[in-house]
């Protein structure tokens, strides 16, 4: 663990009871909490949002906040503050969320509604240029000919932050498992910056704050390059990152060597968590101090995994919450 931030007591330690959901520490780390909506909450939520198909959420963006309010009301208005406090808490910042009874690809639309409600209790999901919507659904199969590692099954997708090649703020990332067939392996990989043993070395390097060019492949539907440093600081001066090895474009030998060494130091960290995410569950993480990736799959001719992602910015009343507390 890095000396910059120690794990503090979290909301789970208080023994607080919540209405409509349960909250426990994950088996992988006290930084990652597991939130489960009860069967009754799930049933009532899906009944109350049934009048709006997913297309309505796509066309009318205010409905995304309305379904969020419905879910929060069903949880006695305890859900929204819990989500924000957890995601803004540097000692935590990550949740594995599921709803009892939502665990089959036939419920894909219900999954999108649930994830949308949760995301819009903490902020707003950005436009995803790859899909043309506020969310993206994509499939991983046994054979892939795409132009990035996103869908390639037989190799590790290295740890990274999202939103590195766009100008929009990307405070959070939501990653949901919609379907899985003939799958072995492929766990989500997570690394909290303060558990990365090499953070001090790279954060204090002269190249850490140099603006670098980030460019996306054609499949991302983003044609404009963006420039920013790999490292920055939050409001309390603690390290945050905007990094992905596939899309950063070093301008010279010095940057190329440093980035290569940085990548190796991240991928070999002893602080990496391997987290299984069953169908219907989703990870919600603070994108500024958590890196995420994916382990490799065992080959199978009929391998299939469908995922849904949302990523966006935090929006909350500043008199109630402190950024990156």
Curated annotation (Swiss-Prot):
SUPFAM superfamilies named among the record's database cross-references: Clavaminate synthase-like
Pfam families in the record: CsiD
Record bears the keyword Lipid metabolism: no
Residue positions binding Fe cation: 160, 162, 292
UniProt pathway annotation: Amino-acid degradation
Keywords: Dioxygenase, Iron, Metal-binding, Oxidoreductase
Name of the molecule in the record: Glutarate 2-hydroxylase
Organism (species): Escherichia coli (strain SMS-3-5 / SECEC)
């Amino acid at each position: 663990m890095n000396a910059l931030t120690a794990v503090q007591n979290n909301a789970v330690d208080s023994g607080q009871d919540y209405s409509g959901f349960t909250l426990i520490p994950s088996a992988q780390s006290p930084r990652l909490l597991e939130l489960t909506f009860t069967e009754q909450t799930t049933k009532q939520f899906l009944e109350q949002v049934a009048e709006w198909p997913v297309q309505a959420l796509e066309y009318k963006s205010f409905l995304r906040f309305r379904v969020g309010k419905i879910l929060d009301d069903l949880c006695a208005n305890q859900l929204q503050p819990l989500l924000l406090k957890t995601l803004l808490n540097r000692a935590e910042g990550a949740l594995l969320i599921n709803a009892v009874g939502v665990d089959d690809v036939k419920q894909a639309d219900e999954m999108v509604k649930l994830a949308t409600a949760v995301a819009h209790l903490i902020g707003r999901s950005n436009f995803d240029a790859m899909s043309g919507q506020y969310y993206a659904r994509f499939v991983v199969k046994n054979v892939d000919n795409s132009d990035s590692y996103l869908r390639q099954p037989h190799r590790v997708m290295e740890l990274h932050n999202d939103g590195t090649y766009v100008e929009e703020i990307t405070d959070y990332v939501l990653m949901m498992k919609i379907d899985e067939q003939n799958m072995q392996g492929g766990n989500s990989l997570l690394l909290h910056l303060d558990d990365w043993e090499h953070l001090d070395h790279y954060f204090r390097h002269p190249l850490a704050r140099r603006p670098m060019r980030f460019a996306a492949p054609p499949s991302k539907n983003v044609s404009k390059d963006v420039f920013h440093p790999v490292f920055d600081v939050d409001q309390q001066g603690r390290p945050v990152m905007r990094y992905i090895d596939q899309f950063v474009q070093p301008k010279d030998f010095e940057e190329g060597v440093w980035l290569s060494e940085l990548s190796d130091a991240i991928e070999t960290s002893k602080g990496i968590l391997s987290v299984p995410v069953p169908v219907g569950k989703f990870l919600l993480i603070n994108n500024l101090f958590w890196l995420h990736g994916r382990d490799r799959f065992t080959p199978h001719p009929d391998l299939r995994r469908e995922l849904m992602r949302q990523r966006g910015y935090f929006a909350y009343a500043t008199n109630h919450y402190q950024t990156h507390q």
